[in-house]
Amino acid sequence: MWKERESPLRIEKRFEFDQYSKISKFMGKIEKLCKERDIYPNISFGKNFVSLSIFLDNKEISDKEKEFSMDIDKFYLED
């Protein structure tokens, strides 16, 4: 579940992985989606996780940002 944060307003989620190779595949899918949707989250990762923060332009999450986050969730569930 994505968490809403304030100052600055954003949504965040951490994805856990049991293999580093899965992180690389996941990040590749995110890169392609970012280019398609013109949304570029802050991304950090380690040997077993990827964390994403999507900064919101408005006071609430837009449909574009909701769809983007749901697509990322789908990528994660594919692995």
Q: Where are these predicted regions, by residue range?
A:
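Short, well-ordered beta-strand elements within core beta-sheets of diverse protein domains
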Residues: 10-18
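Short amphipathic alpha-helix segments
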Residues: 22-33
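Short arginine-rich
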Residues: 31-40, 77
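C-terminal structural segments of small proteins and small subunits
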Residues: 53-79
